Amino acid sequence: MKKFILPIIYGTLLISLSTNAQEKINGNGNVVTETRTTSEYDAIKISGFFDIDLVAGKEGKISITGEQNILSAIIVEVEDNALKIYTKKGTNLHPGMGKKVEITVPLEKISELSLSGSGDITAKSPIKNDKFSAKLSGSGDFDLDVVSNSFDLSLNGSGDIKLKGSSDNLVIKLSGSGDIEAANLKSKNATINVSGSGDVNINCSESLIARVSGSGDIKYTGNPEKRDVKVSGSGSIAKG
């Protein structure tokens, strides 16, 4: 019996120590706005619960609004040409009731965007680049306006993605339970792969390659001349 009890006690102790090692920071209610200055960037990587607005403008002046003691634990830095925004290691942030952390990020031209967490990212102006990729992992949401020759999008989580704009070559990979609404993003060639329970709605005009191996559905508008579709799960592929 001791052989079974000792590992359980040891595991419980480790969990307790890990929890106690986290510095819990409760919002103090004092909402302030700070400007964080960085170098330029061509990628944006967010990890956390923040609400992010992407706006057109000169890169390097990041506006961040929230409770003062919460902001002190949020890191904004550029590393390897990527703007990274995340919480300080070892902290557990708890904003006050109804309080948020809102961040405005100016951009001129970025090639990559990623969010890991429960925050939301909204593009207030079009993201324009020849090649652009976006990745969402977690329960957060994307609302993006994209103009790109080549656009790669990945969703792994329960968050939802809403798109508009245009792309000659669109690639979407969905492996979570979230949905992708891209009927307002006009694409010429679309390659869609759904292996989760989420749904994808797209608009393509020339060619469509679609695969469903999960329970999600793919709906498409437009009249692609070339269609290569295959369903190996319980989902479906249909013209909307």
Where do the PLM segments sit?
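Extended, compositionally simple hydrophobic/Ser/Thr-rich segments
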Residues: 33-35, 41-54, 102-104, 109-240
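Solvent-exposed adhesion/ligand-recognition segments of exported proteins
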Residues: 73-78
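Short acidic/polar N-terminal linker immediately downstream of export determinants
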Residues: 4-12, 16-71, 88-106, 122, ...
